[in-house]
Amino acid sequence: MRSSPESRTSSSPGSVDDGGRTGTIFNIQRFSIEDGPGIRTTVFMKGCPLRCVWCHNPEGIEGRKQLMWFDVRCIGARDCLKACPLGALELGKDGMRIDRERCDGCGLCQEACPAGAIEVVGRRITAREAFEEVARDEAFYRNSGGGLTVSGGEPTMQPAFVAELMGLCREAGIPTALDTCGYCADDSLERLLPLSDMALIDLKLMDEAKHLELIGVELAPVKRSAATISHAGIPVWVRTPIIPGCTDTDGNIANLECVYYDDARPEWPRVVQCAEALWATSQQPHC
């Protein structure tokens, strides 16, 4: 049975929320220009409830630290195997096999690899530590209209940590943005929106059956989150990934158009990627 956001607590399955003391991230990307206006720092949270077949950041799906092996870098030294105290690694003709039940993410294999072919993805960090990294570029935010964007993964799966980080940024005068997939618990979203100066939401497929098949979750909670965000009184960017033959079809774009006209407010100043041109030139649809 597929879980729904309503059945989740703020510490959702796959979440590592511990009350805000620390969070699990897989990247802090400085000088980001695609995750909101201006120059931004994007904090990528680990843990995502979706299972998109085209996932762009699969390392962000699991809520815990995990290993990534890069076959093009591997020189077959096997030092990583010798370094692993749990025997979680096996290198054969088909490549590296990682026993993820055994692996505890200690990182000894990464330290031992002479070619940098194996890496631990994910690190525990306090909200204060994350804020200090974000604050380094405060001058760039001030001069470009940028700020912090919290993305993922799905940031609402670690709401206490994200709330503390956003609060610290707001106290320092750094604008904040929440980038969500929309499949999230209502209480988590409602907790974070008041701390957000803008929101970004991904609307991928508007067909219920295809959404369930290709995204792995029901569509209704995503549409409900879009409606909640549209009434939050903050600017919103709607984003749609371009997946040929899937999200870029006339039918899907028309359905996205319907959602836009149903929920759009003056606070929705930008709709990006494939639907932008259609929305700019078409008449309001009869849905």
Residue ranges and their predicted role:
Residues 28, 46, 58, 100-101, ...:
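Fold-independent oxyanion-binding glycine-rich loops
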Residues 38-40, 93-95, 115, 145-147, ...:
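Short, solvent-exposed beta-strand edge segments and adjacent coil->beta transition regions
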Residues 53-60, 79-98, 108-124:
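Iron-sulfur cluster-binding cysteine motifs and their immediate structural context
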Residues 128-279:
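Conserved AdoMet/S-adenosylmethionine-binding subsite of the radical SAM
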